[in-house]
């Protein structure tokens, strides 16, 4: 009788190795499914934050043009520090130093000060094709020009 109660207590304690392996496998499968979706959601959030910052910079340039009757003239691939000297703090408190991926802005204006373009090279940080319109490429350049997006992320990103 004493042996029966000892054997029962030993079998009632804890999980078996097989049960633990099954649980670890299930957690691994869930993680494998969730991580790519989480990364995609984070990239989409960075795209939206970048677009919001581009609109804010564009608004500052519009306010600058109201006071000066022109956008800043002749900027070529300028970054945020060049623009900060022109628009902060009067038109914008601070110019974001770069896009949501920490890549620098590429800001251009024409020689007459009638057009501006703000470009983010996107997730990959490299200049890509600029076909215009919505694009499903997660690495696409985002281009904002004269208060409108010329190229932007749209739809399911790949």
Kindly label every feature range from the protein language model.
Residues 1-15:
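N-terminal leader/signal peptides at the extreme start of proteins
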Residues 15, 29, 70, 103, ...:
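Gly/Ser/Thr-rich helix-start
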Residues 50-61:
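N-terminal membrane-insertion helices
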Residues 2-4, 109-158:
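Short, surface-exposed interaction loops/tails
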């Amino acid at each position: 009788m004493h042996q029966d109660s000892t054997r029962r207590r030993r079998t009632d304690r804890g999980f078996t190795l097989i049960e633990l392996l099954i649980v670890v496998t299930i957690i691994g499968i869930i993680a494998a499914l969730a991580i790519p979706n989480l990364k995609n959601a984070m990239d989409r959030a960075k795209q939206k934050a970048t677009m919001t910052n581009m609109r804010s910079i564009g608004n500052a340039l519009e306010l600058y043009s109201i006071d000066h009757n022109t956008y800043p003239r002749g900027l070529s691939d300028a970054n945020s520090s060049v623009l900060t000297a022109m628009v902060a703090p009067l038109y914008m408190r601070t110019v974001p130093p770069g896009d949501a991926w920490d890549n620098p802005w590429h800001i251009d204006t024409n020689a007459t000060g009638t057009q501006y373009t703000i470009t983010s090279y996107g997730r990959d940080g490299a200049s890509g094709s600029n076909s215009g319109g919505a694009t499903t490429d997660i690495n696409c350049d985002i281009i904002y020009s004269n208060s409108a997006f010329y190229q932007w992320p749209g739809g399911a990103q790949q």
